[in-house]
């Protein structure tokens, strides 16, 4: 890798850990997702970068799994799109896109309560990601689109976010959704983000959401509930009230940190379920709506590959770090004995450390 023996040693050990994980995930537990209609899906992967290589495809599950076991990539992806020629370099037209999964990507940043560096994670920012998933589902996907929990696939990304796939049980509805083009997907996400909100003609869903928030801010809502022309009603309020109303609307519209490119890009790749996230070493893991709703899923516990939390290393960490808690154990730059789970996190974040004999 380079001329530094200590760095080489770390890289080789990390590579070995990823190989051990995939052998267990594939051969023992069958955790790794095999994208449906595999031969029409593009595969991408990365080692030191998110995506070093893409435009790959496999005709059989056997070939795909054999490749994953051999390469054991730090980052593993599949395309949302189904294509006639997934291994051709180029855009959707060259690849022959004929349908596409619809998925949301919630990717939160550090919150005001986080005390760590921007790239670190903690219970606060992970909790914010959870809250945003519930807002998306309960304020929009369930009431507006008639979906229920059986129609969704929720995946912890292995970092500060979740992927939410629309997978209706109704085959005709699924077929229609997967035939959506870029314009339909764009309209869908812009509606949820309130980008086309028309205060002269308020729809019922956004009206209900905003009335609820107005009540929290002690803004009288009776007249808003009876009219769709909110612009006129707002303009009739006092300056301070009017300012509070607009601030509340802007705050509600910015609640969701949705990656719009995931909805917009025809040939977007998403992380493969059952792989590891190369920046954190945490599992890309499918979870249930109820486990999220009832706060039963703890990413810093259930997202850790348990076998890696039992494999210990003596290390020397050469820079100051914010604390990180994995499976109830807290580590920082003063830690001298750490599990493989924390070692992968350090490596993924480019931390300067050395494995000791």
UniProtKB/Swiss-Prot annotation:
Matching Gene3D superfamilies: DNA primase, PRIM domain
Which keywords are on file for this protein? DNA replication, DNA-directed RNA polymerase, Magnesium, Manganese, Metal-binding, Nucleotidyltransferase, Primosome, Transcription, Transferase
Question: GO MF annotations for this entry?
Answer: DNA-directed RNA polymerase activity; metal ion binding
What are the cysteine partners in each disulfide bond? none
Spell out the GO cellular component terms annotated for this protein, sorted alphabetically and separated by semicolons.
DNA-directed RNA polymerase complex; primosome complex
Tell me which CDD domains the record gives: AE_Prim_S
Looking at the record's lineage, which domain of life comes first?
A: Archaea
Q: Name one GO biological process term.
A: DNA replication, synthesis of primer
**What positions does UniProt annotate as the active site of this protein?**
105, 107, 259
Cofactor(s) listed in the protein's UniProt record:
Mg(2+); Mn(2+)
One Pfam family of this chain: DNA_primase_S
The record's section on HAMAP family has: DNA_primase_sml_arc (MF_00700)
Q: What's its job?
A: Catalytic subunit of DNA primase, an RNA polymerase that catalyzes the synthesis of short RNA molecules used as primers for DNA polymerase during DNA replication. The small subunit contains the primase catalytic core and has DNA synthesis activity on its own. Binding to the large subunit stabilizes and modulates the activity, increasing the rate of DNA synthesis while decreasing the length of the DNA fragments, and conferring RNA synthesis capability. The DNA polymerase activity may enable DNA primase to also catalyze primer extension after primer synthesis. May also play a role in DNA repair.
Instruction: Tell me the protein family, please.
Output: Belongs to the eukaryotic-type primase small subunit family.
- Assembly, per entry: Heterodimer of a small subunit (PriS) and a large subunit (PriL).
What is the protein name for this chain? DNA primase small subunit PriS
Name its species: Methanococcus maripaludis (strain DSM 14266 / JCM 13030 / NBRC 101832 / S2 / LL)
Q: Which gene encodes it?
A: priS
